[in-house]
């Protein structure tokens, strides 16, 4: 098992979803976490290179979706759903409400439909 802070895990997922090569962090330098990881020194300060993570499948929940898969979240749904949708090869969304295209204000779309492969009506 590999232990990560929630923020490090989220950033590794975000890096994978948006095609980044990873990110640098000083967190973990001089601890067990640093073993086996590349250390990069910038201006005399050491950083660990945390490589990106990719998911095969993401199962996420949205408050509202249109039939093109554009998603709106409510409350804590905003945390990592958009990041996981961008990261996964296949994204399956359960939506509380599914509306016709054009019935959602585009200014409030949190995840564009391009990241959604399957849409299911939920409870």
Language-model segments: what does each one mean?
Residues 1-123:
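Conserved alpha/beta enzyme-core scaffold
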């Amino acid at each position: 098992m590999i232990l990560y802070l929630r923020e490090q895990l989220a950033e590794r997922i975000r890096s994978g979803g948006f095609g980044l090569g990873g990110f640098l962090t000083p967190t973990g330098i001089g601890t067990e976490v640093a073993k086996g990881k590349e250390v990069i020194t910038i201006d005399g300060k050491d950083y660990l290179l945390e490589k990106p993570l990719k998911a095969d499948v993401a199962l996420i929940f949205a408050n509202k979706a249109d039939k093109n898969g554009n998603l709106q979240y409510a409350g804590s749904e905003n945390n990592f759903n958009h990041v996981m949708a961008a990261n996964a090869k296949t994204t399956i969304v359960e939506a509380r409400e599914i509306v016709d295209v054009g019935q959602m204000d585009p200014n409030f779309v949190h995840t564009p439909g391009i990241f959604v492969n399957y849409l299911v009506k939920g409870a």
